[in-house]
Amino acid sequence: MSSLLDIGCLFLIALIIACIFSKGYLRHFIVALTIIYYLIGNGVLGTILALPLKSEPTDVKACANTKGIILLGAGINQAFGKLEPALSAYDRILKVAELYNQYPQQIIISGGTPCGEKLSEAEIYATVLYKLGIPKSKIILEKKSKNTYQNAEFIKKILADDKDTYCLVTGGIHYKRAKIIFDKFAINTISIASSKFVPNIKILPNAYNFYITQIIIHEYLGIIRIYLSSI
């Protein structure tokens, strides 16, 4: 019953009703739209699109000998008047804490200040890491970047000509684009995917699958933009 009440499922019902009562070319268009909508909502299309992008969560042992850890921002939210990391950011933060506890290294947190806010992503994420027992002396804040390209650009300025290898921690879907951009700036990294962030295939469509598919499409557009800028 709860699946039927999901907004994704309710909109599908509305489209089916529109198919029944529409005629001519409009009906053909709505039928095609309904099929595409269903394939996105049930997770099939998103799962197919995610195949070239996704990476399984990587064991932190891969970064046992890196010089430092780079944590990329994933947004912030305001809850009860207090700024905190977005839900999609916590897996990255926890992966960094896990990595640091096993292989203590300098941490660089990269994330600027969203429009209208007073604190940067980097500062807010750092607060969580401090609470997890990581000392302030081990954390460097990069507080200017607004996107992944700027993450790499400003971190390159911090590292200068450092040729050592760093552990790059980001989400599973963001993994590939981040690696491409950091390679573009000649920053040597071993990438760790903090989560397996993919659609869930269901019979009935749900809002979660639309959300994930939107993120996947965003990543494709970002990768296309990188290659176009190189032409």
Residues covered by each model-derived region:
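Short helix-capping/hinge motifs at transmembrane helix termini and TM-loop junctions
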Residues: 22, 160, 229-230
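Membrane-embedded alpha-helical segments of integral membrane proteins
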Residues: 1-21, 217
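C-terminal terminal-structure detector
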Residues: 208, 212-231
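A structural signal for short, hydrophobic/glycine-enriched beta-strand patches
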Residues: 43-210
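Membrane-water interface of alpha-helical transmembrane segments
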Residues: 2, 24-31
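Structural signal for the C-terminal ends of transmembrane alpha-helices
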Residues: 17-25, 41-43
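Hydrophobic membrane-insertion alpha-helices, especially the h-region
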Residues: 28-43
